[in-house]
Amino acid sequence: MRARLLLLALVTTASLLAAMTAACFGGAVPAPTPRRTATAVATASTARPVAARLPDARVEALLRRAVCWLDDPTSAGTCVPPSPDALAAIDEMGRSGDPRLVAPLIDMLNLDLSWRGPLDAALVRLTGEQSTDARGWREWLLGQGQANAEGPPGYARWKARLLALTATPETKPPYEALFGATLDTSTLAALHWTGVQPDANRPLHDPANVNARAQRYLPPTDLVYGVVIGSEARAYPQRIIAWHGVVNDTLNGHAIVVVHCLPCGGAVAFERGQSGGSTAAGKPRDFGTTGLALHSRSLIFDTVESRLWDGFSGVALGGPGSPGSPRAALTPLPVFTTTWSDWQARHTTTTVLDIATGVVRDYSAGAATRDEVDSTRALHPVQADTRLAEKEPVIGVVPASGPPLAFRLAEVQTRQLVTAGAPGAGVVALSEGPGLAAGVYAAGGVHFVRAEGNGSGFAAIDDAGGRWAMREQALVQVGTGKELPALPWQQGYWFAWAGAHPETEVVRSGTQP
């Protein structure tokens, strides 16, 4: 789907970025030094000027002039098109030589308000670089490490006001509260607006569900994301949750959140009422969508504490504490990505979301994901890691010890059994077969040698001939009931996993059994 927001009826809608985020491993290839995007930016002939930093008061004045500073964001229509004074301020920013102004100029390019030409010229003067588009400038910022530089004074509040230019009389985006004093400058500079207002995708809250036999809209081959807690199983169809981004749900008495990160190519689930998930008051968190992306990973926010979270990794970006302090993290839950028929065969008593969500959407197969699937690149700016293709599907895991690991999903689904680490001492990635469920488990001293069967009849075979059935929460040995615990894995595109875990090692296929 291609979400397009009319900026007060004065912004050209055709220029807005398509998005649907309102709503992510034996021998291994070590993580490299982050790479700059190769084709987005070329060195310009304009030499970068050398100048002293401007006084803070002067920087603040330029930023206010450039974006038509308003106390009432709903009156921002008077800023469009930019006034001669705003354009003069942009030109002065480019000639200033002050590197603190690079990120704000790129932020302004994120919105198409008839100022592309002046902004490009200012950035060329200020950086000595040039780019073909706004995305290229953002990726240059990420790849060159400029996002780690000191930001201008009042940067968080200024960027919140900049994005408020997208507001309408009906919306009051909580950007100022979300950016807050504890969001570090490097993160703030990397935040990219996707063209969608917070909660515009209508997150679901304890949506209605039905038993498997009662549903009438899912064909056997439809993709679902399955979650199991205790004895209860529930399927979250892609065709539904891809529209909404966030599902705040309760399963077997546990408050959970299922996040579909459209740009990341998958869904993840977390506890939202247990350790790390509950609010300071001890209540389950309630999450919404922000319309913001960090390295093309959808960001969500806690609607009670106005706190930003990475919707793919489940890590908080800000909130109580000071910048640089340990960040809170949600407890991840294993998610099986598989077909409806496979899930139903595994869990005959499963429930599934009712198609009657109370929201009018085209819930036909593929409608919500069409634009993302058709794109060969990440939907939004990312920092390149060229060890794998940007949108190579992977299954990632953070073991109890050692670096994060990434398995190529195609290899796991084809081979059905891929190990990492010494026999019996590492982890094992398993799959029922192409297009079916995959998961990662601790080897626990067991040496797995091959896989047999497909679908619900799949079994992993150890070197003593023992058969192990793949379950969401553990590998279970047939006959003895012995269990090897599941490691909370995440399935999505390479860029999403590598961006959240840059120290990741990629499992080498040549060392697998």
What do these predicted ranges mean?
Residues R53-A76, D98-L109, S131-R138:
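Amphipathic alpha-helical scaffolding segments comprising HEAT/armadillo-like alpha-solenoid repeats
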Residues F25-G27:
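Bacterial signal peptide processing site
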Residues M1-L10:
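Bacterial N-terminal signal peptides that target proteins for export
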Residues A9-T21:
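Bacterial N-terminal signal peptides
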Residues V29-A52:
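Ser/Thr-rich, Proline-interspersed low-complexity disordered segments
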Residues A47-D56, A76-S96, P104-D107, G117-E129:
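Structural detector for internal amphipathic alpha-helices that build alpha-solenoid repeat scaffolds
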Residues D71-A76, I106, A121, G128, ...:
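Mid-to-C-terminal functional-domain signal that highlights helix-capping/loop sites
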